[in-house]
Amino acid sequence: MKTTINNWKLTDSQPMQYVKCSFKSNEGGEYNHYKLIQMDLINPDTKKYEVYFDTLCVDDYLESMRGELSIILASYGYGDDEEDCAEIIERMMEEYGDDVFQVVCECIFEYYGSFQAEVLFTGSEQDCIKFIENYCENN
């Protein structure tokens, strides 16, 4: 299993989650747009998995969905869902530094799962692993 492929970083080996920064803001030099891909088991009986993909921007959640972002971050143990998400993220910066927005995007991606993301492929576990590695090599 490769830990980096074409600037995609493996962030969670269980679902084969890879993350790649797709945009760096000019204001403050923060990375806040990320592409994410991973696989999940969709049918334990047939051992079928699906690969799904999304592009997320932290600013979208900070501007219009602050309460929802607080709930998402709280569900991963990063604060209280009654807190303002900016305060939660500020505390997270102490732990994650420059990677804080990547971690926030990972939380959003995992929270919504394939419900919000685009399903790219369905197949066996090995076929999905190969698909993800190929996707990362070519994108």
What name fits each language-model region?
Residues 1-4, 130-139:
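Short intrinsically disordered terminal tails
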Residues 123, 127-130:
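Short, charged alpha-helical segments
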Residues 19-123:
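Acidic, low-complexity, intrinsically disordered interaction modules
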Residues 2-20:
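Extreme N-terminal leader/activation tails
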Residues 6-8, 24, 126:
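Intrinsically disordered and other compositionally biased segments
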